Amino acid sequence: MTAGTRPEVLHLYRQIFRIARKWQAASGLMEETIKEREYIVDEARKLFHRNKQITDVAMIKECTEECKARIEIGLHYRNPYPRPIHLPPLGLALPHSKVFRAQEKLRKQAKPVYLKSYDEIS
């Protein structure tokens, strides 16, 4: 993390914890609220810890944009979990063929900004 990006990253980190503290589940049930609050805190810790070694300013900007998008989507839909998306299937292409590489490229392009930190599960 560089000196220029540090305040923004720390602001986002604190903002997530403030949101988690005030979070109410859409169902109104206390056990779901507690579970969702724990998920928000655990997810933030996991992703910030995973990305703490990043020093490239462009990559840090991507991560902060992803964080902002996740916050906005979570608050708008009142759902702390990432929204499911449809990714193009890989089909029956051989793993080292041009078709497979083209399909991989399409899958990466189709992935929205708020899911860049998630690994591919197909």
UniProtKB/Swiss-Prot annotation:
Q: Name one GO cellular component term.
A: mitochondrion
Q: Which family does it belong to?
A: Belongs to the complex I LYR family.
Q: Transmembrane segments in this chain: where? A: none
Q: What is this protein called?
A: LYR motif-containing protein 1
Which CDD domains does the annotation name? Answer: Complex1_LYR_LYRM1
